[in-house]
């Protein structure tokens, strides 16, 4: 299996997750109850309609504990799966499969939950031309995986961290003294991608004049967003952000903004209802 993500050590993640579960004694239940030579076949299935994400990670958990395991992925990453759909079939040593079961399920449930909610937001703005972005509102240590899940749901990734673009927010402006001064300092530092958060229309011109390359229009209602987009006049991409819900996102998308960023797709996504049942091989 090949599954790689930039800025993410998959092996370290798998090892740390299993170590958390196994402690110093290992899976004492499976060791006591399951014969060492026993073999199982299991099927992971969806108990609700979902968008799938994370099956390669489930495979990695099983393969770490049983290098000879046979894994068959029955759907693709980013695919829609209806209620009762089989997602993955796994056959191997029973003890290893039972030991890895919870870790494999946890990550697929979590990432598929994010992908599923993301797809709902993407579908809500279909046809408007606006693009859904995720945010840095992620669980510490899981950002790369959660942003992978939003891509499977149809969103695009915003900044991966503080290192890949400048984002000048209200607290930066408060210290710098003004929007224009904050942007000028970022330009002077040689930063090429400068995102500037504005929450008033009178901040737009100073931000653009100073060298902003992207404007984040924060907590603006649809009429104000439309006016802001008109003032920007296509000079840089625009992004609506702040308090966006499934009920409000389409009206904001129809104002002509380039992007809409939504923290809820990672911060508030419920785990997908996915199960895994085993039987003797």
Predicted features, each with a name:
Residues 2-210, 223-231, 237-239, 246, ...:
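Acidic/glycine-rich phosphate/pyrophosphate-binding loops and surrounding catalytic core
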Residues 218:
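A Lys-centered signature of the CheY-like receiver
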Residues 275-281:
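Active-site loop ensemble at the mouth of alpha/beta enzyme cores that anchors a bound cofactor
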